[in-house]
């Protein structure tokens, strides 16, 4: 009986850890699949608002764009108009952000950019140097005049066990990015 009392706290921590980590991995898998589907949609000439509507309609737990998630569509283009300020530069050509969670894209520009409806294209894409990206992941090369379609999804992960009370931290925001 004494041995059981000694081992029980450790056993509880292990069981709660397995349950919580499994739950977080399942949620991350859902976020990753949703992100890939978003990039797949926008790479096939679906408008950004239509793609956002599709992802909103197909999302379920843990993703709820009205309360605890954020979706960011970005289209990267290499400037192809010779003689312009953005010729040969990777620029943020289109962007649509949707959702209630306060999160920002890993793709940042050098300055201010405006992306208005209905197509959410950048204003003055050939001449606005503020659209130039600060850096792309190593190995990502955008051909001249080509585009790369990027989807990012952030969602808040809710714990289902008191696992964090034992000093073990599980991420509270899950994130996925897909480049097509």
Please identify what each model-predicted range represents.
Residues 1-59, 69-78:
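Alpha-helical assembly-interface signal, strongest on the long, hydrophobic N-terminal helix that forms
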Residues 61-63:
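Amphipathic, coiled-coil-like alpha-helical scaffolding segments used for oligomerization/assembly
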Residues 65-69, 83-85:
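Short, structured loop/turn "capping" segments at alpha-beta junctions
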Residues 70-75, 150-152, 177:
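Soluble periplasmic/extracytoplasmic beta-strand elements of cell-envelope proteins
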Residues 79-172:
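Intrinsically disordered, low-complexity regions enriched in Pro/Ser/Thr/Gly and acidic residues
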């Amino acid at each position: 009986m004494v041995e059981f009392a000694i081992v029980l706290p450790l056993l509880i921590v292990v069981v709660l850890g397995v349950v919580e980590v499994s739950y977080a991995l399942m949620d991350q898998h859902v976020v990753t699949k949703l992100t890939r589907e978003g990039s797949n949609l926008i790479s096939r000439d679906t408008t950004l608002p239509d793609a956002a509507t599709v992802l909103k309609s197909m999302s379920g737990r843990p993703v709820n764009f009205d309360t605890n998630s954020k979706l960011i569509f970005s289209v990267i283009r290499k400037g192809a108009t010779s003689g312009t300020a953005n010729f040969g530069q990777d620029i943020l050509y289109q962007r649509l952000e949707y959702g209630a969670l306060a999160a920002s894209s890993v793709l940042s520009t050098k300055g201010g950019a405006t992306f208005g409806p209905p197509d959410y294209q950048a204003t003055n894409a050939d001449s606005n140097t503020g659209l130039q990206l600060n850096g792309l992941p190593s190995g990502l090369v955008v051909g001249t005049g080509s585009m790369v379609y990027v989807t990012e999804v952030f969602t808040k992960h809710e714990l289902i066990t008191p696992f964090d009370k034992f000093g073990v931290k599980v991420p509270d925001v899950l994130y996925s990015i897909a480049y097509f």
